Amino acid sequence: MKITSRDLIIDYGHCVEKITSFLRYYLNKNGLKGYVMGVSGGLDSSVCLKLVAQGVGSKRVYALLLPEVATPTEDMEDALTLVKSLKVRYDIINISDIVESVRRSIPIYDVDDRVADGNIKARVRMTILYYYANHLGYAVLGTSDKSELLLGYFTKYGDGGVDLLPIGDLYKTQVRQLARYLELPSRISEKKSSPGLWKGQLAEEELGFTYEEADPFLYAIFDLGLNPNEA
């Protein structure tokens, strides 16, 4: 049985309705005032921002732009353009000094271990997001997708440290299609995925395969229950 990307096509209108209604339900059920989330200007966070603003209204959303020295300028420009267009409250906090302070505090810090160093950045961002959430009575909205979750391609207690994942049941290729459905700018919907933890980092180069290759395989195993040899 050969699974292809065509097998992952879904009704994106229905998908948007399900996600936005759940976002409203989650706030009401838990007595929360709104959502706070990190917005990087990348595909996943942009889709999540559009969905949550549409679902609960821009006044109940707080976006945090958390750049540091390795953050591409164009990503911050895309993030800023999007939050302004959606009329979402936002703050820009450059985390470079915080990250450098953590580095200096670690006796065994190794400048050449870019994975461990990159994860410091992700965890600093998580800490800031949860300060806002605690102070405002908000929930932290995560932006990881199903492909990243199944591949383990996230930072534990970093971008994995959230309260809910609205696109956590959508594969990366589906999120890209959803971005087009939501009419996000093409420079976002077609942007190459990157965790943004060091300069030049690209997800597919680091993984060694494309999401177009991985998603049908993951779908066959985890959704259809097929043996890997059958996928």
What positions do the PLM features span?
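Catalytic subdomain that performs nucleotidyl-dependent activation
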Residues: 84, 117-125, 139-216
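Charged, low-complexity surface segments at secondary-structure and domain boundaries
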Residues: 203, 228-230
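Residue-level recognition of oxygen-bearing side chains
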Residues: 183, 226-227
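Short, amphipathic alpha-helical "recognition" segments used to contact nucleic acids or chromatin
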Residues: 214-226
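Conserved NTP-handling cores and scaffolds of large molecular machines
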Residues: 106, 183-186, 221
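A non-catalytic, amphipathic alpha-helix used as a structural packing/dimerization or gating element
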Residues: 14, 18-22, 170-181, 223
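ATP-dependent adenylation/nucleotidyltransferase module used to activate substrates
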Residues: 1-154, 231
